[in-house]
Regions:
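A generic structural signal for tightly packed, nonpolar segments enriched in small/aliphatic residues
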Residues: 1-120
């Protein structure tokens, strides 16, 4: 989301997860690979942004606040009992200027996560 660019700039991807161990593994893999990630909260209070009178779920909040967290709250409605994480790469996946191109991120982070063999 563009909201993660506002929150973190272009130096780190945002991470939200329903499992702290998974979030920690992602953040550690980011540090190890140089493809940093920073955890943002995903509290029960954030779930209210998915309520709407027009549909079963809203996929966007009603204002400017917590946009990246609202995206994770929406995704959480489809995860049931799984451990999951949302890595918001809008800030890190592309160059802003002068070159408009992909950076390849979060490939280093995800590669480190998979190669670390800590996933269970």
């Amino acid at each position: 989301t563009g909201a993660v660019v506002i929150a973190l700039g272009r130096h780190a991807s945002g991470v939200m997860a329903n499992d702290q161990h998974l979030a920690d593994m992602i953040i550690d893999a980011g540090e190890e690979s140089g493809d940093r990630a920073w955890q943002l909260p995903l509290w029960d209070e954030h779930q209210s942004c998915t309520k709407t009178r027009y549909a079963d779920l809203a996929n966007i909040g009603g204002g400017r606040e917590a946009g990246t967290i609202h995206a994770a709250a929406f995704l959480s409605k489809f995860t049931n009992d799984y451990k999951w994480a949302h890595i918001d790469i809008a800030a890190t996946a592309s160059h802003s200027s002068p070159v408009k191109a992909g950076t390849g991120r979060p490939v280093p982070l995800l590669s480190e996560l998979l190669l670390s063999k800590k996933l269970k």
